[in-house]
Amino acid sequence: MHAVPTHAASPERLPFYRQLYFQVVVAIVAGVLLGHFEPQYAEQFKPLGDAFIKLVKMIIAPVIFLTIVTGIAGMTHLRTVGRVFLKAMAYFLFFSTLALVVGMVVAHVVQPGAGMNINPADLDQAAVKGYVAKSHELTLTGFAMDIIPKTLVSPFVGDNILQVLFVAVLFGISLAMVGDAGKPVLNFLEALTAPVFKLVGILMKAAPLGAFGAIAFTIGKFGLGSLVNLAWLVGSFYITSLLFVVVVLGFVARLCGFSVLKLARYLKAELLLVLGTSSSESALPSLMQKMERAGCGKSVVGLVVPTGYSFNLDGTNIYMTLAALFIAQATNTHLTLGHEIALLLVAMLSSKGAAGVTGAGFITLAATLAVVPEVPVAGMALILGVDRFMSECRSLTNFMGNAVATVVVSRWENELDYSKLNAALDGEPVQALPAEAAAVKA
């Protein structure tokens, strides 16, 4: 069983006003109030949110690379890498497909678009042309080829997580294969992990500012009132996503011996950060640290979390089928069982090809509708105004899906320390990771 050294002292519990989740809550509330009462002024704070997300993306590649390389190089059997990857992909495929089916079922039961009687010819197709154009770039072959970087260092100057993952896995395997000759390199990378983790901690201190700027801009630009016309669709999506996390992921968590609600409480600071920035990537480095600290194997965390950010998008999948059927209902487009099965199959593929794409949910929806001509792509103009408000829910659901997946795959691999997991989920102070302890000493 994987065990993280526990010689480091447990961190003392901080006063509530110094804890990240409290600071982010205050920032979000302040952003909402400013956006509602001073919308024009609030829009000027957009650079705060953009800057914070850029800062986090700056550190994502080093965190992923160091975590994966040191994890794989420390494995005694390289066959373990392939086994972890296959188990993770099997999990991702099953639950991503289940999320698509859930979105489709809810759309049939709730009928959010029924009675709107929209004529597609009356819609402003120009509003969605940009998204449709980007969707044509999402092909399965192009997606696969894009995983392979042009040079060994190019992934570190781009924003494609899968390229970093690809290089890290290959380098980690190579380092493990050279044995003792690679020890100096491995020791150097393990030492380098300490300042990188320290930098993550420094950047996270700016999270409240980022959340404030992002939410103030969103409310200021789009307004709370913009939700009213399509509140039924938005409400259906939020409730469905909540039920998916609590019921579906909750059932899986219970089978594996933990509570998804306790896991959400443990990750509350990261969830609030995702809510404020509308980007699950903003919490990726912190998620990797926390899952390892909670007893998940380092090698499992290094493989499952970054891969899940591209292949395990439960929230995006629920959104895609729910939104597609909403458009069909709103435009009185009749879909046969064959049409819906085709929609499901296309969505299974297109949802995997949007890693690192801005507005991924909307773009993958355009890609799906472009291949299933029965549903008018122009109908996307109906949800363009409220898509931004559904983005937060997509990101939150995606985030929780990846957190649960990490624990589940760790359990399958017997790389889960239940004593650490239970302590973390019960709110007890947890042992610092070796790299974190070294960073504190530094």
UniProtKB/Swiss-Prot annotation:
Pfam families: SDF. It is found in: Cell inner membrane. GO terms for biological process: L-aspartate transmembrane transport. The chain crosses the membrane at residues 19-39, 55-75, 90-110, 161-181, 199-219, 232-252, 318-338, 366-386. One of its GO terms (cellular component) is plasma membrane. Keywords: Cell inner membrane, Cell membrane, Membrane, Symport, Transmembrane, Transmembrane helix, Transport. It is a multi-pass membrane protein. GO terms for molecular function: fumarate transmembrane transporter activity; malate:proton symporter activity; succinate transmembrane transporter activity. InterPro entries: C4_dicarb_transport, Na-dicarboxylate_symporter, Na-dicarboxylate_symporter_CS, Na:dicarbo_symporter_sf. Its main location: membrane. Belongs to the dicarboxylate/amino acid:cation symporter (DAACS) (TC 2.A.23) family. Responsible for the transport of dicarboxylates such as succinate, fumarate, and malate from the periplasm across the membrane. HAMAP family: C4_dicarb_transport. This is C4-dicarboxylate transport protein. It comes from Delftia acidovorans (strain DSM 14801 / SPH-1). The gene is dctA.
